[in-house]
Amino acid sequence: MLLHIPAIFTAEEVSRIRAALEQAEWADGKATAGYQSAKAKHNLQLPQDHPLAREIGEAMLQRLWNHPLFMSAALPLKVFPPLFNCYTGGGSFDFHIDNAVRDVHGGRERVRTDLSSTLFFSDPEDYDGGELVIQDTYGLQQVKLPAGDLVLYPGTSLHKVNPVTRGARYASFFWTQSLVREDSQRTLLFEMDQSIQRLTHDVPDHPSLIRLTGTYHNLLRRWSEL
């Protein structure tokens, strides 16, 4: 499942965040890539322990943990602290698959990368190229969203970032370990949850809603890993 979640941050908030990112000191993005990925990665990255990365990352996670659509789709158990990158001057990241497990806080905790997310901090008209290209069972998708919007997709997906030939593309990316590791099961639960929410709005007193909601929770109970 590939899902577009709009307006995590407002235009005014994005403007302030981007201004701060433009003034930050960036490092070579290869530092956080695996052996194979490092050969394909040509971008800049904010050091993970940078105060700005922590500040924006905490604000992002607070928004997402209170966002009904993200919670419904991701069913998050753990989230890897958001990272921040910049593509400019021809920077790109060729096709790769993210590492299956990421160490957090010096290896004291691990996160399985069931889901990948990218949150854009540059508007499409501010740069040429830079499309996030995702290849999975749903086909080849090119993603270039408005600033403040997020795309959520399976961590198993082959993906790349096209070269940025004009301007700069600022974004955040992170991984989520879901309560439900299989994408097909998460998709089924997401579609069921969205249907229950619509029915609750349209026919709030329908007697089948209780049974349908119970079925959702029984499936979640069957498939959850804690």
Curated annotation (Swiss-Prot):
<dbReference type="GO" id="GO:0031418">
    <property type="term" value="F:L-ascorbic acid binding"/>
</dbReference>
<feature type="domain" description="Fe2OG dioxygenase">
    <location>
        <begin position="78"/>
        <end position="178"/>
    </location>
</feature>
<feature type="binding site">
    <location>
        <position position="96"/>
    </location>
    <ligand>
        <name>Fe cation</name>
    </ligand>
</feature>
<feature type="binding site">
    <location>
        <position position="169"/>
    </location>
    <ligand>
        <name>2-oxoglutarate</name>
    </ligand>
</feature>
<keyword id="KW-0408">Iron</keyword>
<dbReference type="InterPro" id="IPR006620">
    <property type="entry name" value="Pro_4_hyd_alph"/>
</dbReference>
<feature type="binding site">
    <location>
        <position position="98"/>
    </location>
    <ligand>
        <name>Fe cation</name>
    </ligand>
</feature>
<dbReference type="InterPro" id="IPR005123">
    <property type="entry name" value="Oxoglu/Fe-dep_dioxygenase_dom"/>
</dbReference>
<keyword id="KW-0223">Dioxygenase</keyword>
<feature type="binding site">
    <location>
        <position position="159"/>
    </location>
    <ligand>
        <name>Fe cation</name>
    </ligand>
</feature>
<dbReference type="GO" id="GO:0006974">
    <property type="term" value="P:DNA damage response"/>
</dbReference>
<dbReference type="GO" id="GO:0005506">
    <property type="term" value="F:iron ion binding"/>
</dbReference>
<dbReference type="InterPro" id="IPR041097">
    <property type="entry name" value="PKHD_C"/>
</dbReference>
<dbReference type="InterPro" id="IPR023550">
    <property type="entry name" value="PKHD_hydroxylase"/>
</dbReference>
<dbReference type="GO" id="GO:0016706">
    <property type="term" value="F:2-oxoglutarate-dependent dioxygenase activity"/>
</dbReference>
<dbReference type="GO" id="GO:0006879">
    <property type="term" value="P:intracellular iron ion homeostasis"/>
</dbReference>
<dbReference type="Pfam" id="PF18331">
    <property type="entry name" value="PKHD_C"/>
</dbReference>
<keyword id="KW-0479">Metal-binding</keyword>
<keyword id="KW-0847">Vitamin C</keyword>
<dbReference type="InterPro" id="IPR044862">
    <property type="entry name" value="Pro_4_hyd_alph_FE2OG_OXY"/>
</dbReference>
<keyword id="KW-0560">Oxidoreductase</keyword>
<dbReference type="Pfam" id="PF13640">
    <property type="entry name" value="2OG-FeII_Oxy_3"/>
</dbReference>
<protein>
    <recommendedName>
        <fullName>PKHD-type hydroxylase PA14_58580</fullName>
        <ecNumber>1.14.11.-</ecNumber>
    </recommendedName>
</protein>
